[in-house]
Each structure stands twice: as C-alpha cells, then as structure tokens.
C-alpha cells in the first residue's frame, strides 16, 4: 500500500531552521542596540541630591506636589517608580534608579496610583484612567496637521512629515485606524508642533534634554515636542551628543494620542525614557497588544508582519507590508501547519 507522506513529516530540520530564522528576527532589535554603545554605557553612581529625586518623583506623579514627604512615602514612591520602569525594586535611590532619573523622557506622568487595578490588566501596558479612546465610526480615520509657525530649525519640514508618516504607519499597521495628513491645523484631530518653555498648556518644557515631548489623552490630540531639543532623523548627519531621534519620540507620543499610558517593558515604544542618540522606532508585542485591546486588530495584521517590521515600510494607511513580511508569514504558516499535522 502506498503511504502518502505529509510533506513536513520528514523535515524536522527545516522546521527548526525556520524557527531559528524567526528567532533571529525577534533578536534583531537587541543586536542593533548592542551595536549602539550609548545604549549600554552605565554611569557610575550619579550625583543626584535627595531633593532633586523628590522633585522628579513629584513631577511624574509618584509623590504629591507641594507637600513634605516622609521617609515611608518616599520609599513607597521609589518602589512604584522602580516597578514602573522595570528596575530592580529596592526602595532605595540606588545607582540604577539615579541613572534612570537622569535620562531624557516623555513629560507625561507614569500611571502610578496604587489603585489602578481596573486599568492595569495584568499586562505591562497601561491605559489612561477610564480607558479613553477615539470613538468614531469604524474604520476610524484621524487627521493630523503640523503647526507651520512651530517647527524645529534642525529639520526640513519634508523630513518631519516623512518621519511622522512612518510613525503613524507603525500604529496603523496593527489597528483599524488610518491617519491622514491635512493642511488645516485648526480642525485636525491631532495637532503637532514644536514649542519652547511655557507654551500655554500648563505643561512648560524645560530646555535641552529632560522632558522631550508630551501629549494629552484622547480625544484631545495635542502632540507637543520640545523645540529646545536637537531633533534628528539621521545620526550620521547630526553629530550632536544631545541629539534626539524624532521618529522614536513620534512613535511613543502617538501611542499616548491613541490612549496608551507608559509601559514598564524596556523594549516597548511606550517605555517612558529615551537616551540621546538612540533609536526605538518599532512596536513591541506589549505596545501591539495594548493598542489592539483599545481598537481591535487591523485585518491585514499578522504577528509575522510585526516580526518583519524591521524591514517593512508600512504606509500610513497600514495596508502595505513589503515582500519580506510575506516571506515570514508564509514560513510561519508552513511551520504552524507542520506542527498541526506532525
């Protein structure tokens, strides 16, 4: 009797090899970061005074403003800070914590109320209290515009637009939302601009580094970047030691615009800090699961397109993923079928 062999039965090697490819792709990001020395330079115990630490904890919601805090509440605040930033939890102002406090970051407070059970869904991602999101007819279309008077002297407007188109595309590829650029700043859903110091929203910027940008929760749509930063799109061209990657910050702030808070996963786009001269432009699983739980899934999205996002150029409508994504999708579909039929 002729036995019909399933094509996968004889080929455990190819299956293992395909997994190795997927594994390589997952680890791409770590490899890229390892090549960038600024990601891994650890300061010796930095010199930060206790009053400065307390000010930082107040600014980001860990300690009440204008109130003298006792040692117990200071220690509790440090524990919450360490937990929210994925640091070793010691309750002490140790060198890991101080190095983190010195890093440039998003100006949005971290989600720190101890009573966040309803929003902290056991995952690392976080929503704003009450889970606000953009509620419109599906498929959701949001417009965005740049304030023409408030751009950055470091970049050409075409570069700024290109970077934001790419950053919006990252989110559009995983949720059923499309982002459309408009000239009309006044009526745009999402209003993007670079501002100096006090700019009228009660959240003044602080000059070079420190706070890089801030955003308001849905459905406000204001996305403000600190004009004092040396914004960069290409570190080969921009040599400044305090240069900040615009795309990394754009991806993060758009996450807030959509309703995500800060994540404690260091590789997530929604992690609050970003070192100067470093890039973090891809969504992490944590970001994807978080935003999909608010808006649902883009019908074109597959996990493999996320894995292949290193090499994809998603358009802002999220519809096109380059051929590499297709190869990975096909590979892993084949793998899945092999396992089902083994």
From Swiss-Prot:
- Covalent lipidation (GPI-anchor amidated aspartate) residues? 317
On the tree of life, the source organism's domain of life is Eukaryota
Which residues are the propeptide, according to the record? 35-124, 318-342
> Which stretch carries the motif Cysteine switch?
104-111
Q: Please name the GO terms that the record assigns under molecular function.
A: metalloendopeptidase activity; zinc ion binding
Q: What class of enzyme is it?
A: hydrolase
Q: How does activity track with pH?
A: Optimum pH is 5-9.
Q: How does the protein associate with the membrane?
A: Lipid-anchor; GPI-anchor
- Signal sequence interval, chain numbering: 1-34
How is this protein named in the record?
Metalloendoproteinase 4-MMP
Q: Which organism is it from?
A: Arabidopsis thaliana (Mouse-ear cress)
* Name of the encoding gene: 4MMP
């Amino acid at each position: 009797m002729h036995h019909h062999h399933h094509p996968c039965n004889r080929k455990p090697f190819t299956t293992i090899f395909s997994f190795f490819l997927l594994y390589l792709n997952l680890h791409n990001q770590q490899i890229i970061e390892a090549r960038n020395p600024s990601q891994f330079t650890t300061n010796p115990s930095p010199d930060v005074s206790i009053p400065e630490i307390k000010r930082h904890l107040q600014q980001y919601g860990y300690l009440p403003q204008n109130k003298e805090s006792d040692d117990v509440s200071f220690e509790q605040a440090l524990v919450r800070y360490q937990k929210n930033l994925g640091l070793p939890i010691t309750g002490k102002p140790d060198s890991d914590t101080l190095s983190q406090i010195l890093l440039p970051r998003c100006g949005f407070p971290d989600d720190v109320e101890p009573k966040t059970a309803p929003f902290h869904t056991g995952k690392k991602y976080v929503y704003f209290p009450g889970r606000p999101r953009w509620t419109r007819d599906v498929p959701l279309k949001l417009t965005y515009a740049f304030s023409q008077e408030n751009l950055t002297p470091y970049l050409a407007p075409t570069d700024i637009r290109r970077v934001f188109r790419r950053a919006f595309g990252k989110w559009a590829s995983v949720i059923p939302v499309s982002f459309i650029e408009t000239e009309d700043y006044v009526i745009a859903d999402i209003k993007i601009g670079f501002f100096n110091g006090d700019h009228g929203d009660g959240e003044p910027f602080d000059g070079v580094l420190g706070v890089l940008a801030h955003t308001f929760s849905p459905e406000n749509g204001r996305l403000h970047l600190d004009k004092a930063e040396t914004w960069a799109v290409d570190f080969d061209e921009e040599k400044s030691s305090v240069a900040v990657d615009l795309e990394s910050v754009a991806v993060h702030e758009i996450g807030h615009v959509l309703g995500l808070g800060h994540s404690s996963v260091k590789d997530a786009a929604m992690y609050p800090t970003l070192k100067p001269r470093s890039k973090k432009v891809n969504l992490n699983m944590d970001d994807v699961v978080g935003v999909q739980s608010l808006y649902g899934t883009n019908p074109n999205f597959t996990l493999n397109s996320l894995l292949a996002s290193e090499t994809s150029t998603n358009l802002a409508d999220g519809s096109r993923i380059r051929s590499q994504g297709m190869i990975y999708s096909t590979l892993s579909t084949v793998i899945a079928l092999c396992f089902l039929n083994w």
